[in-house]
Amino acid sequence: MKVEGGSGVKAGGRSGLIAATMDIFPTVVEAAGAKVEHAIDGRSFLPLLLGKDQPAFDRDLFFTRREGGDRFMGECIWAMRRGDWKLVKNSPMTNWELFDLSEDPGETTDLSGKNRRKYRELGAAMRVHIQRGGAIPWQKR
């Protein structure tokens, strides 16, 4: 993400913080001196923009894209990040893959067979996310 500076924003800074578009709103709100009055998923990264310490966000990030056309028939492509780990299903017709982005930022070596513990851990979190997203309020769980 590239941010153009203004008053108080440190020029030329770089960071490894993983932020998402949902983090822009709370950042702008904090910069305006206001408060978000309800629960939201995004988190402010204003301290980072001001050149202050910004702890990493302790959260999972989930990504979904629904594919159309005859080949995919509306199936989804899924991914999640937990720290340096990424679990991804790049096509509805492929297996889930696991990557350690600190060692393999290009995602060239699938570790799902070598690190079964991490694969199961992230897989369980992904299942919960998918089930929550598809939940219908009146259905029993």
Put a short name on every predicted segment.
Residues 121-140:
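Charge-dense polyanion-binding interfaces
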Residues 1-2, 141:
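Conserved N-terminal phosphate-binding loop of PLP-dependent enzymes in the Aspartate aminotransferase
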Residues 104:
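Intrinsically disordered, low-complexity polar regions and short flexible loop motifs
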Residues 98-101, 111, 122:
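Generic leucine side-chain signal with a strong bias for well-ordered alpha-helical environments
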Residues 30, 51, 114, 124-128:
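Residues within well-ordered alpha-helical secondary structure of globular protein domains
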Residues 7-13, 17, 22-101, 132-136:
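C-terminal cap/loop subdomain of S1 sulfatases and analogous C-terminal strand-loop tails that border
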Residues 109-117:
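Active-site-proximal N-terminal segment of extracellular/periplasmic enzymes that hydrolyze or transfer
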Residues 56-57, 117-120:
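Cytochrome P450 catalytic domain signature, combining two hallmark sequence patches
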